[in-house]
């Protein structure tokens, strides 16, 4: 329901949230099984609105909490950038993001001057100047990073557009540099 809620359509948002809640309770055996959501902003909204029995995880938490000790990480001599989304920071997951990236890369850059990408849900599609303004300090603070990672596809689009490097899901980093 987040897409509807952010546009002011509260009734539709509540209806979609209820539909999602019912579907996830069924799929997770009433919360017994964990659920992975690939977008950190969506997950934050889900945690705020859905049944508390649901064990909801975003990619960083899921990999860190469930897979980190089961995988063998190969640390490569690369510098990667990570971006902690606003929702990642609100959920307190930013340290896990940096640590997870550090298991795969010799150097991790997380520009302190960039606290929000400025994409603002879907507004970056319509107002790219919001994104450009939010990321004004990104490019000069990448310090040799050749690839970037985050946990929100829309943020990653804007980060890629404004950085000169490609940003993608942290899942790609973990999959690329691990084995069982």
Task: Set out the residue ranges of the language-model regions.
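Iron-sulfur cluster-binding electron-transfer modules in prokaryotic oxidoreductases
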Residues: 1-180
